[in-house]
Amino acid sequence: MPWRPEMGYHGIACVGGEGFSVNTVLGTMFKLLAVAWRPPTAGPWIEAVVSGMMARDLAEASAALELSPAAIEAFSAALSTYEGADAEEALHAIRREETRLFIGSDPVVENSEGTWLQRAHGVAHPIRMINNHSVAVADFMKECGVVRKGKYNDCIDYLSNEFDFCGYLADGGTLSVPE
């Protein structure tokens, strides 16, 4: 399935074919993870989940990279529970789970590198958005030619953004970068 920028998601059914470099497959894997870690949305994102496409594509990329199946086993298992489900019900359930995992003063999972590092260094109530770790990530991305859009108001070091950036680097940093 070709890249569909209007969806922000692309399939990789042909990834095992000849002519795909390891970097291409690695870039695809990172982009799939970026999509999977973004906040759940109606439309193409949830359709990729309930159709099973997201789980299949992650499994194919993982196999093409010769990763241990255990590397994405739990993630794939979680995604597969929504396969064939009603999209609206699945979206509601996934949003509830996202809130449980990532939101609040003491989230189960820290989805921002800067706040995760602050907690690792003993900061009880880390500052989100602007902290020295997040600024370092933004500076590194800028050195690589990736600059956030003027009105971008999310943490640049959210996992989904960093996965997207790793995909960009795996592709050789040659993708067109929005100004």
Language-model features: locations:
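Intrinsically disordered, low-complexity segments enriched in serine/proline and basic residues
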Residues: 1-12
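Surface/interface-facing alpha-helical segments and adjacent flexible terminal/loop regions used
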Residues: 11-179
